[in-house]
């Protein structure tokens, strides 16, 4: 078992006690710097990071392999990677990049196959001059999404 596999196993075991928290990123550098990125259905509390950090640190032997450890919540501007993240962000505005376009819109639905985005657009009137505001919706399969990021509005 590699060092990274061992760390991943320890994280998986620790997360069994915290079903609302899930692993987004795990990186282990050549110099054995462990970086863990977590997310949660209701966010990630500092105590969650501490608990996961302790679960890793207490089960690895620094005599066998010295390492540094960083456990954190993924940032608001981090790309969404799991379907579970899309589902938790329904109702929020996303910037979604696909192969053909970049869309900024509200996420109104997320299931196991695709998401549905909704936004308002100005289009030429069907009759007469000028433009009118119309509501648009687009269904995008996860397989077509290159990147999706939640936008922060103040």
Curated annotation (Swiss-Prot):
Keyword Manganese included in the entry's annotation: no
Keyword Cytoplasm among UniProt keywords: yes
InterPro entries per record: Ribosome_maturation_RimP, RimP_N, RimP_N_sf
Entry superkingdom: Bacteria
GO cellular component terms attached to this protein's record: cytoplasm
GO biological process: ribosomal small subunit biogenesis
Annotated Pfam families: RimP_N
Keywords attached to this entry: Cytoplasm, Ribosome biogenesis
Subcellular location(s) per record: Cytoplasm
The family this protein is said to belong to: Belongs to the RimP family.
Biological role stated in the UniProt entry: Required for maturation of 30S ribosomal subunits.
PANTHER family: RIBOSOME MATURATION FACTOR RIMP
The protein's name: Ribosome maturation factor RimP
Protein species of origin: Flavobacterium johnsoniae (strain ATCC 17061 / DSM 2064 / JCM 8514 / BCRC 14874 / CCUG 350202 / NBRC 14942 / NCIMB 11054 / UW101)
């Amino acid at each position: 078992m590699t060092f990274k596999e061992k760390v991943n196993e320890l994280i998986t075991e620790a997360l069994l006690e915290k079903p609302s928290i899930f692993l987004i990123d795990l990186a282990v550098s050549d110099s054995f710097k462990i970086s863990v990125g977590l997310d949660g259905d209701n966010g990630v509390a500092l105590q969650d990071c501490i608990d996961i950090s302790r679960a890793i640190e207490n089960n690895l032997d620094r005599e066998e392999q010295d390492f540094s450890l960083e456990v954190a919540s993924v940032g608001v501007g981090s790309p969404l990677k799991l379907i579970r993240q899309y589902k938790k962000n329904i109702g929020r505005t996303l910037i979604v990049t696909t192969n053909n376009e970049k869309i900024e819109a509200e996420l109104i639905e997320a299931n196991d196959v695709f998401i549905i985005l909704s936004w308002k657009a100005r289009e030429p009137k069907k009759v007469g001059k000028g433009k009118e505001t119309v509501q648009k919706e687009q269904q995008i399969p996860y397989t077509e999404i290159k990147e999706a990021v939640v936008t922060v509005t103040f």
